[in-house]
Curated annotation (Swiss-Prot):
Record-listed Pyruvic acid (Ser) modification sites: 25
InterPro entries recorded: Asp_de-COase-like_dom_sf, Asp_decarbox
Binding site for substrate: 57, 73-75
GO cellular component: cytosol
Gene: panD
Enzyme's top EC category: lyase
UniProt subunit comment: Heterooctamer of four alpha and four beta subunits.
PTM comment text: Is synthesized initially as an inactive proenzyme, which is activated by self-cleavage at a specific serine bond to produce a beta-subunit with a hydroxyl group at its C-terminus and an alpha-subunit with a pyruvoyl group at its N-terminus.
Name of the molecule in the record: Aspartate 1-decarboxylase
C-alpha cells in the first residue's frame, strides 16, 4: 500500500512578488527549493495564512539567495505582497519506506525568507 504523505514544506514564507501576467507558477529561491527537496516543475500546494486561500501550482526556480516567493499567473490573485504562506509538496510513499524511517523535509524561514532552521517532523500538538 502507498500513502499520500507530506514530503516537503516551506513554513511561513513571505510573498515577495505577484506577477499576474507571467506564465503561471510560483518562483521560489533556489536555496529554499534545495533545502525543502522541491524540484522545478513539481506540483506544490500553497496555503495563505493571511486570508485562508489554498491553491495548487508548480514550482520554478527563483534567484538563489534572493528570498523570492513569486506567485505568477492566476496564483497572483490569491495573495498580496507580504502575505505569509506555507508551501507544501506531497508524495506517494510505500509502507516499506515508512517503516524504514522515511521523513519529510520541513524548512522554516525568517522575515526575509532566509532559512532559520529545518526539521524532519511536525511536533506533537499539546493543549497547554
Amino acid at each position: 500500500m502507498q500513502r499520500h504523505m507530506l514530503k516537503s514544506k516551506i513554513h511561513r514564507a513571505a510573498v515577495t512578488h505577484c506577477e499576474l501576467h507571467y506564465e503561471g507558477s510560483c518562483a521560489i529561491d533556489e536555496d529554499l527549493l534545495e533545502a525543502a527537496n522541491i524540484v522545478e516543475n513539481e506540483r506544490i500546494d500553497i496555503w495563505n495564512i493571511n486570508n485562508g486561500e489554498r491553491f495548487s501550482t508548480y514550482a520554478i526556480k527563483g534567484e538563489r539567495g534572493s528570498g523570492m516567493i513569486s506567485l505568477n499567473g492566476s496564483a497572483a490573485r490569491r495573495a498580496q505582497l507580504g502575505d505569509l504562506v506555507i508551501i507544501a509538496a506531497f508524495a506517494m510513499i510505500d509502507e516499506q519506506e515508512l517503516k524504514a524511517g522515511w521523513k519529510p523535509d520541513l524548512v522554516f524561514v525568517d522575515e526575509d525568507n532566509k532559512i532559520k532552521g529545518s526539521r524532519d517532523h511536525v511536533p506533537t500538538q499539546n493543549w497547554t
